Amino acid sequence: MTDLAAEVEATRCQARLFALAERDHARGLVEVRGSDAGRWLDGMVTNETIALSPGGGCYAALLTPKGRIVADLHVLAREDGYWLDTSAWAVPNLLQRLERYIVADDVKLTDRTADFGRFSLEGPEATSLLGVP
């Protein structure tokens, strides 16, 4: 069996971890922190985010005042704030639009795109390896 055939078989029958190159999976990550982060973010995106527990998440969008989509994103709640997972190309515009609405709020936005790598665990045994029921 060739190396490629063995990798395909392992993925099909068990699980395999893939490193996702930036060019293959261009995702961006924005960190939202501060004592007002939950309330502020809840008013900025289309889904209810303030009720999210750490480790939870939801799909949402950032809209213009006229209702046009600026970016679609996944909001991931953390103990100390939120992560906004979106397309890498959307991050500069997302940051620019969000920053204009931080007036007297204790909110800090940080582009964390370059700080993390992306991996994908694939195969029928993936969830059991992660301890997910």
Short names for language-model regions:
Residues M1-P133:
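Basic, glycine/lysine-rich polyanion-binding surfaces/domains
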